[in-house]
Amino acid sequence: MNQDKVFENSLEKIIPDNIEIELKTPNSTVAISEQYQNNIDTQKIWQIEIPKINLVAPIAEGTSANIMNEYVGHFAETPKNKGNIGLAAHNRGYKINYFRDLKLLQKGDLIIYTYNGEISKYSVNELGIIKDTDWSKLESSSQDKLTLITCLEDEPEYRRYIQAVKL
């Protein structure tokens, strides 16, 4: 079976029959029809955007190595749309390091969080370093906020955190 056919078969598993696509080669960009682009289910988009560091990243449930090798991970113990939403990602040493520039954020910087079609804006209000055993920044809260956590370079027992409050 040639490479184009293998690629085409794998697409059949993720693109419904009623969607028109143009397939050139497995190494080219697949041109998806305008009909498909207009029908993308915005209810399923889950992402974080941080304009200051040019970050737009998908989010997935969990913080396992497998999840964080492809996504920003969501701490399952935290809510997804209200209260204190906890997210984690790598900042170096992996194929995908979404939080590599998190250290550049400052108070007042904008973070845009999209979940279930709802877009929420947050403003950074707290930045700091915590022990890797300190989970207090992820505690439940009646205030809507995002907590971003990543490793601290060359200090494996510490974590960098950013908290942002909903605007």
Please place each PLM-identified region on the residue numbering:
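Solvent-exposed, non-transmembrane regions of membrane-associated and secreted proteins
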Residues: M1-L167
